[in-house]
Amino acid sequence: SQFYGYDLWNIYEFPFLLRGTPQLRMIQIKFPQDFPVIIESKSMKLYANSFYNKDFKKQDQVIQRLKSDLKTKMLTPDISFINKFENPSDNQIINHENIFKFEGFRSICPVTSQPDWATIYIYSKTNSLDRKFLNKFLLSFREQGDFHESCIIQIFNTILESLKSSSLNKKTHLEVVGKFLRRGGIDINPIRSTH
């Protein structure tokens, strides 16, 4: 199915040297949903930590280097230093009555076999979110070995098909957000939407 969205990566410990002085900054990387590869978080952690002894004259050079290293032939992710991460309260996230919030979502990392935990937010303009089905469906991921992005895409596609089959109007609006907890200094937050 066609969808829109992005994967928001927050790297909480990004070390480098700025004119010989050690720096430890936070970096945010926004990968478009159609980025041709899924980067494994352990690889990203090792890559980020490889900067600990690289010296730059200006901070902008760090961002330029990251963009150069991470771009593909067609796409370059948005990358920026940030001073603090936006952490919206539940009241900011849940401002619609048609939002289903599922805490304690669990899947298994296919590389390390470690659990990945998240809060999943599902929004639909229709009132046809079957909460009992959603609860059972999201619980079914508890032993599933898959990447964050793949889990959210599977959740999005399954719910979208369910909404389309239960609605006379085949144009339905759906958003699925996975706010995964940090592991190894990185959290990954996939977001998928019909538009």
Segments from the language model and where they lie:
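N-terminal intrinsically disordered, cationic/polar leader segments
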Residues: 1-195
